[in-house]
Amino acid sequence: MPTRNLLLGSILLSLAVKGDPGPHRGARCGVSPLGSATELNYLSRIVGGRESKKGQHPWTVSLKRNGKHFCGGTLVSHCHVLTAAHCLLDRNVKLYMRVYIGEYDQILKEETEQMFRVIEIFKHPNFNQSQPMNYDVAVLLLDGSVTFDENIQPACLPNPDDVFEPGDLCVTLGWGHLTENGILPVVLQEVYLPIVDLSSCLHVMSALKGTVVSSYIVCAGFPEGGKDACQGDSGGPLLCQRRHGSWVLHGLTSWGMGCGRSWKNNVFLPHNRKGSPGIFTDIQKLLGWVSSQLNTAVPNKNQESCSMQDGVLSGKSGELIFLKNPMSVTRTMSGAPGFSLSLKTCTSCLNFTHLDIESDFACNLDYLAIYTDSHRLIGKFCGDIPPRSLLISFSSIKLNFFSDFHENRTGFVLYYSAVEPNTYPDSGCGSFAVLFEEGEIQSMNYPENYLSNSRCHWIIHGPSGSYIKLQFEDFALEPSDDCRSDYLAVYQDLAAEDKIETFCGFSLPAPVYSTTAVMHIKFSTDERDNDKGFRATFTFVSPNSLVEDSRQGNMPSTNKKETTAQDSICGVSQVPPIFIYNSIAKVEEAVPHSWPWHTSLQYAGEHVCDGAIIAENWILTTASCVLNRKFNDVWLVDPGIHDLLRPGHNQKGLVKQIIPHPSFSSQTNDFDIALVELDESLQFNSDIFPICLPGKTSELAPASLCVVSGWSLRGKEAEKSTKLQQREVPILTDDACSAHYIQNPGGITDRMLCAGIGTGQDNDSCSEQSGSPLVCLLEKKGIYTIFGIASWGVNCKENSKPGIYTKVSPFIDWIRQIMSDTGQIHSNLGDPKPHPMGNIEPEETAGRDIIQGGFPTNDASSNQNLYIASSCEDVVLLQSPGEIKMETKSQMYPNGFSCQWRIIAPKFQIIKLVMKQVHMSAENGKCCNSLIIYEGISKNKTLKVRFPTDEMVPGTVWSEGSSVTIESPPHPVDPEFGFCLVYSFHSRTQSQDHVVPDSDSSEP
């Protein structure tokens, strides 16, 4: 069969942006010369009307009348400022208004200031003075060009695909009143607020008479109030930070009912006390209009043209569509310029021959984005290194080019063609590349999260005799042990058999070198926990250059985990925490071992609650976790663990004693704190390290942002994660906390604190996350300190109410006293003496019977009374000797019932099981009924023996460790089913073969 030529069309698209780049020189939108403000500010104070640092927000503008500030604004180009239209109602405002850029102190005349007049004002045509919060935006054209320096930079306008979600933390700035009708500040203030869901905001606003709002707004604030923008802040920016650092003008301060009022119960408040979230004009939704003003508002600006005849497409807004006949062209206007290629039943091949787009680490300034026809992002490209031979396994793709207004480049040139779908093997992720020249590769969708269940391949061919160097610029893949989840594997042969290395996690890998002229790269993802992926460049190097690097000691070494202890004594992590989202509404997986003080507390082999390491022998947790689980030998502390389903660190600790606070009340949850002393000291390293305790008088300011970590942070109704999660939560005022829990017995006491956000919905108080540490970064010291322990109501339902934490500072003296009495065995747990708060009956353990009794001091096979366990569903047996007996003839069991017994011996002892009798009907014995013995009691228990086995009844089974599980699986009721088993504890020297048929089993 002859080969068909499937080249449906080839066209040169060249986008050139014209204009003089001179005025923009030195501009870098959204980048603060002082660096990111989030590292410590988010973790110390997210709100609070505090003074900003001079130069921290170099795009902030002060509009003045007769030398006095009246509104704010934001610099977005060398000659444009965005502000609120309602600030400009006076028809003569252009005559007296002065624009101050680089302003910080309203009294001092600073060298950083630049002052301009306004030559033109462009208000949105839909702005209506009678409804001032709708379309409340205006563009000011300055009478000169701003000189950019370290104190003056423009903010980034939002991209069409920027996403800022409810709960994301953004900052608003201004010189407005510090309180409602209060004084004006002298220097620039900053207030961090979470984005509020638009539907919730509109619902709140509906309770305010006379307010008419549209969907062209952004809402931000706390339902409890306390922090907000205020009078004089109008027109100022609401800036949100992209994941990669640049600040985006998300909104303009427009309106609010009062300043910092609570709005969570507006319906029940009189009108003069009603509040609202802060209302900001949504710049992204009005980006088309804003862009058109920035394009047309420059005098003598060369207008750009669009021409298909000469193959050059220029202009900031347009769409080029190739229909079935690829030479049939239409052009339509849209918010973002773009081109669509439709190649029916074929695979699209894009070959860039030129790329010159403003370079940015995450391609957020100017970029070319490639999408599928369903708007699934394939990749974003910028800089001057063209991607090579991009094969996209979709027949229809869309190319969108976006440019801000700061740095002009020549654009890009690409050829597209259609190839047979089977010309290259399908990668399963939408792209496959065979590369013959030096260049750059990146994961699909980068820098946004890559897709699930993807299999991507790149094959790089270097010149004969050369080696290939792969240099990573960015790297963030789901971390996992041995990189078994998401991973990037690098090989040095076509068959992908000679592996160089496999990578995952968040650490930037060292450069990778092949020792052949071929490098094969595989990128594989599973179904969950996606991240932003990677970007890397590859170059061809000679073998001689590698030899020279090796001699000079410049060859990279494999990344090895450091296990040396930190110089600090507490509160420092060698693995820095990473927050993908600047949000108080999102739970995300923690970087493994980034919270090295977090530990799992396990009872009878199962994780039951969390704790925090505070010393080599001590764990801090809640009394509610340990009160009804009274047997020390059943407890296990597992530090340094990230995934509950995978083996953690080898320092699992046995428990010496458990000490709940003597005043703990299960009715009020007051004094909910406990200490666990380990039998042996922990050895601190990078995975296991203590958290710092606060001072006795340490207090957190309201709205301080702290972090809670744990395995159940996604809420009671959500699937629990086996991997450690983290979440940023704000500290609430005592009054706001009490308002959420009016019905709580005993109220919110001085020994409790509230953290998180809530909608005020009903919440069944629970302890799903009991014991999880609430830690805060102390800005001055740069260390983490534990201020709270999750007590109850923490994430029982998603965001329903703030969680209640035990405040640690009031208990510092008690903690120190207990820890100083190291040799004393405290008897707070299970103490027969009256409880200081009155006699408290132990709460029932749902679905489990714990057979109480102390461990024998001598060999358990000595003559003692035989303990008979008659319960069935989930029984923990700690007393020896004992008997398990079950008779369906004398009990009424429903169809499908199941039973489980867990026998736990003291440490260093094993268990002897003697099966006396097993009987059942002949018919059920063939198919259904059985009795199974497992080694161990956790989810990782292993099958040991299954009964009935005629030759083993009667018979003896010896355990290998100190615990076994006996199960009777679900089955239909068998009136003849029953068994009798006796057990006893022994030292290891007394064990026989693991399964021995008995000729005489009269003794257990």
From Swiss-Prot:
Disulfide bonds join C71-C87, C170-C240, C201-C219, C230-C259, C363-C382, C429-C456, C483-C504, C609-C625, C706-C776, C737-C754, C766-C796. It catalyses: Preferential cleavage at 371-Gly-Ser-Arg-|-Trp-374 of glycoprotein gp43 in Xenopus laevis coelemic egg envelope to yield gp41. Its EC number is 3.4.21.120. The active site is at H86 (charge relay system), D136 (charge relay system), S234 (charge relay system). It holds the Pfam family Trypsin. Its main location: secreted. GO terms for cellular component: extracellular region. PROSITE patterns: CUB, TRYPSIN_DOM, TRYPSIN_HIS, TRYPSIN_SER. It is found in: Secreted. The gene is ovch2. Keywords: Calcium, Disulfide bond, Glycoprotein, Hydrolase, Metal-binding, Protease, Repeat, Secreted, Serine protease, Signal, Zymogen. Residues 309-419, 429-541 form the CUB domain. Glycans are attached at N128, N351, N408, N763, N940. This is Ovochymase-2. One of its GO terms (biological process) is proteolysis. Belongs to the peptidase S1 family. The catalytically inactive 110 kDa form is processed both N- and C-terminally to give rise to the 66 kDa catalytically active form. Residues 1-19 form the signal peptide. Specifically expressed in the pars recta oviduct. Residues 547-558 have a biased composition (Polar residues). The keyword Hydrolase applies. Residues 20-45, 584-1004 form a propeptide. One of its GO terms (molecular function) is serine-type endopeptidase activity. It is an enzyme of class 3 (hydrolase). Residues 547-566 are annotated as: Disordered. Residues 46-295, 580-820 form the Peptidase S1 domain.
